[in-house]
Amino acid sequence: MTWPAVWAIVRKDLASVIRNRGVRIPLLVTPIIILVFLPVLLVGGGELLASSGTVPIDAVGASPLDRVADPQLQERAISAVPPAARWAVFVLEVFLAPLYLLVPLVVATVIAADSFAGERERGTLEALLHTPTRDRELMLAKFLAAWLPAITVAWAGFLVYSVLANVLAWPSVGRVFFPTPTWLLLAFWVAPAVSALGLGVMVIVSGRVRTLQAAHQIGSLIVLPVVLLLVAQLGGVLLFEPRLVAAMGLLVWLLATLALRIGAGSLRRERLATRL
């Protein structure tokens, strides 16, 4: 393994991401919306309305919970939480948990699409093929160039979200309650796996399309399972709890390994050369 060559490709790809506004904006906007804007809007806005007396949310029956969550889900997730804190805890612990997975997924897929399909569209793929690296090293470099930023953004966002969650919920909860074991598993077990799976899918997709736009359009379908998880949880079909999240992470890692093995075939020089 020629590590200097691997890191040279990683640095080149990261520099391209920083220069490319079309890639840079989604990397910033997605975590800000999910991990900052939504908590402030849903929890901060609810606390403000409650304190002003405009909307009573001190009981589950008078809160927005009945309109967004299945009663069985409420019983399983927040039955032990004081009534005044149920809305805040539900939003921060339950509702936003599946959406958090969109952060590493979007970051990984956006960078991967630019790294693979973008190289072909910009006409820089041919030069890359002439670098003194083996196919395995090229695959590793491309993987690290997207996976490392994805988990960095996911973990930095998790840290910011943890502080923000405790600040927003303090008026009703009255203590530091976050992060929970479920969220720790999401951040450090599932998020890296989701990033790897997104990368594997984008490698497969990018090997079969010629434009960055096409890669984005097809690759965007990978967010659908996350949306289905959110709907299933709100419907009471499942609840993100430690054992389920641990098992889900294992499944995602297995799928990611399979996708990356399939995608590795798309990065062989002879196949890339035929698609220039």
Where are these regions (language model features)?
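A structural motif at transmembrane helix-loop-helix junctions in multipass membrane proteins
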Residues: 19-25, 115, 174-223
